[in-house]
Amino acid sequence: MKKFIKYLIRLYNDIQAKLTSHPISHLPLSKVDIQPIIMIPGSSATENRFNKMVRKLNNGQHPHHSLIRIKVWNDGHMTYRGHLKRKDRSPIFVVGFQNNRDGYKNIKKQAAMFNAAITVLREKYSFNSFKALGHSNGGLIYTVFLQQYLSNHSRLKMEKLLTIGSPYNLNKKEISDRVPMLDDFVTNQEKLPQQLQHLSILGIFFRDGDGIVHRSSVEAGRLIYKGKIASYREAIIAGKDAHHSSLPQNDQAIDLIREFLF
């Protein structure tokens, strides 16, 4: 009977964590030092974007990784949903934005909002190292963060960055037709942390891309990262499950994420 009651309490807490948002100041404490995995979704997506992917990542893993979903609102305040296991050394934080629109101007705003979020997380958990994942424009937000904000954080190190279908040259199909954002990324590549390891996942769903992002736009990441960081490599996923929106929960992608980040 006691076990059943405890189960009901856990179930209730899980449901409440999923349904109820809390002020960021109410984030629970951790009993251990953490090295979080922090994820950023792409444009139009919310902090719930990676729910299915995280369920797949946790499948067969013991213990499961905590999932905390943070939303940064346009007025600067932040809320969160989810539950932190207090002895989880590698919890997953997803940071989404009220302003989740596309375009370089918005990407720069989102990078500033992410910088505010990671400042709050470090004040709460005092970590000096983290691993990162960005889907689509999430990878672009991370690139802006690395070049413009990371050095402002004392002793903070991004150990690994995994990007999925990130369009470093936006919607262009020819690498010779470079957008201003890509030019800025290349100009500022010396600001990238030299110890960083980067894995870029590219989807081939139809001809030369994942149905949304052209192959050459993802491969433009070479111009930014290759030779400037500790390691840069690319992985190609092809087939009917390699569409841009399907890539984060693609089984091959899940294997690559586990291998690289966990």
Segments predicted by a language model, with ranges:
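Lipid deacylating catalytic domains
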Residues: 7-133, 140-262
